[in-house]
C-alpha cells in the first residue's frame, strides 16, 4: 500500500509562494552564503550566481561549484513498487470512451519501459520512500491529464491520464531561442503525462532521451514510451532555478532559512510549486492545488 505515512510526510505545503529572496520576497536574504537569483531563488550554481543572473549576495569571483550529492540508497525494480493491477486501479478510467488515451495509450508496460531508463526513479530509498515518489508522480501527472469532474463515476480522482494533448486552443508556445529553435509549423503546447510545453523544454528533453522533439513534438502524444519518458525526464531534471521533483520527494533537497520562513518544506507542495507555482502557489486556497492533493490522497490509500 501507499501508506498514510507517505501522505503525512509530504502534505507539508499547500500555499507556498513562488520566490525565496530579493525583491520578489520582500528583500529576504539567502542563508548559508547562497546567491539570490534574478528570479528570487537561492542557490550556488551559475544560474543563481553568474554574471547577469544574480540580484543579491553575488560572489566577487567565479560562481561556487555545487556539492556532488552521494547516491541515495536504492533497491529493486520499479515493477516491485507498482504492479500492473495497482496501475490499473489508480488510473481506473484512463481508457474511458471520452478519453483521448482510450485505446490503452497510457499502458503499464510503456510506463515500466520508460521508467527503467531513469536510474533512481521510484527506486531510491526504502520501500516507503519509493512508494511515496510513485504516488506523488502519478498524482501530479493525473491532475495534468484529468478528465474527471466532481460527480464522476468512482469520484474525480479516478480519472487521471485521460488526455494526451492540452485542451482548448493552445498557441504554439514558441519562445525565440538560439539553442532550441522552433521548427517551422511545429507547436509546443502541452502533451503527455506532465503536459510538457514550450520549445525550451521539448528541446532538452528530446536530447536527453535521444529523440528530436523540436521537429517531432507530437511524438509525445503518439508514442507511449516517449510520452512517459517526457514526464519522467521533467520529474528527474532540476527546473532551474528550482530543484527537481525527484530530489524534493526523496529528501535530497534541503530548504534554506528563507524556504522555511515561507513554509517551503520538503514534500508534495514544493513539487506543485516546481511544476506550476507561478500560477497556483501563494494565492491562498486554489482548486488546482486541491485537485493535485486529492489525487495524492487517493493514491496513498491504494
From Swiss-Prot:
Q: What is its EC number?
A: 3.2.1.14
* Record bears the keyword GTP-binding: no
Give the residues annotated as coiled coil: none
SMART domains associated with the record? ChtBD1
Location of the region described as Disordered in the Swiss-Prot/TrEMBL record:
59-79
Q: Output the Gene Ontology terms for molecular function.
A: chitin binding; chitinase activity; endochitinase activity
| Gene Ontology BP annotations | cell wall macromolecule catabolic process; chitin catabolic process; defense response; polysaccharide catabolic process
Disulphide linkage map: 21-36, 30-42, 35-49, 54-58, 162-182
* Amino acid composition bias (Pro residues), ranges on this chain: 61-72
The family line of this record is: Belongs to the glycosyl hydrolase 19 family. Chitinase class I subfamily.
Task: Return the PANTHER family for the record.
Answer: CHITINASE-RELATED, ENDOCHITINASE A
Summarizing the function annotation, the protein's role is: Defense against chitin-containing fungal pathogens.
**What protein name applies here?**
Endochitinase 4
Organism of this sequence: Solanum tuberosum
